[in-house]
Regions:
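Residues within well-formed alpha-helices
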Residues: 14-15, 140, 144, 165
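Glycine/Thr-rich phosphate-binding loops of Rossmann-like dinucleotide-binding domains
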Residues: 118-119, 163-165
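Generic detector of bulky aromatic hydrophobic side chains
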Residues: 9, 40-42, 49, 109, ...
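Beta1-alpha1 glycine-rich phosphate/pyrophosphate-binding loop at the start
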Residues: 1-79, 168-177
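Residue-level detector of alpha-helix initiation sites
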Residues: 9-14, 35, 114-116, 136, ...
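Generic non-transmembrane alpha-helix signal with a bias for helix starts/N-cap capping motifs
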Residues: 59-60, 138, 162
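FAD-binding core/adjacent interface of flavoenzyme oxidoreductases
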Residues: 1-4, 64-156, 171
Length: 177
């Protein structure tokens, strides 16, 4: 049985690990368009706030360690662009090389994550306005806060990540609204 999983952070990585426990002979390929898999999303604000001091502590698994533990082939920087459900095939873009190829599957699991909502407000694209969804966003926010005298911050969103972001900006001494 050939499983293809789209998305390699929380849901996709958990699905891959569970599949391996259920079927030791399955071929499992996990595609992640980002650079990292299986990282602690809820830890991102705590890295920005300095509670987690070492960036590497955000990562639960690497593609190599995930393969060694679960025999799951992980392809980072690989974006699934098209699904042909009838032919049971996905079209994948290798973001490093720019090449496109197809991968066949017997079963497909979709766990691509979410995109932050950026309301159509004037100035939303200005410098110093961020969204927080992944490690790259975290690096941008931390670099900005480390290199500037940030006088205040506004956090829009009161989910777990928004609340933790407010907590950790406050921890850095930045007044938060």
């Amino acid at each position: 049985m050939m499983y293809v999983i789209v998305g390699g952070v929380a849901g996709g990585a958990s699905a891959a690990a569970r599949l391996r426990r259920l079927d030791e002979t399955a071929e499992i390929v996990l595609f992640e368009k980002g650079e990292y898999i299986s990282y602690a999303n809820c830890g991102l604000p705590y890295y920005i706030g300095g509670v987690i001091e070492e960036r590497e502590r955000l990562f639960v698994q690497t593609p190599e360690s995930f393969y060694a533990r679960f025999r799951v082939e992980v392809r980072v920087k690989s974006e699934v662009k098209r699904i042909d459900a009838e032919a049971k095939r996905v079209t994948v873009s290798d973001l490093n090389s720019g090449k496109t190829y197809e991968e066949s599957y017997d079963k497909l699991i979709l766990s691509p994550g979410a995109e932050p909502v950026r309301p159509p407000l004037e100035g939303i694209g200005e410098e110093g306005i961020f969204t927080l969804r992944n490690v790259a966003d975290t690096d941008r926010i931390k670099s900005w806060a480390d290199s500037r005298n940030v006088r205040r911050a506004v956090v829009v969103g009161a989910g777990f990540i928004g609340l933790e972001m407010a907590e950790n900006l406050h921890r850095r001494g930045i007044p938060v609204s």
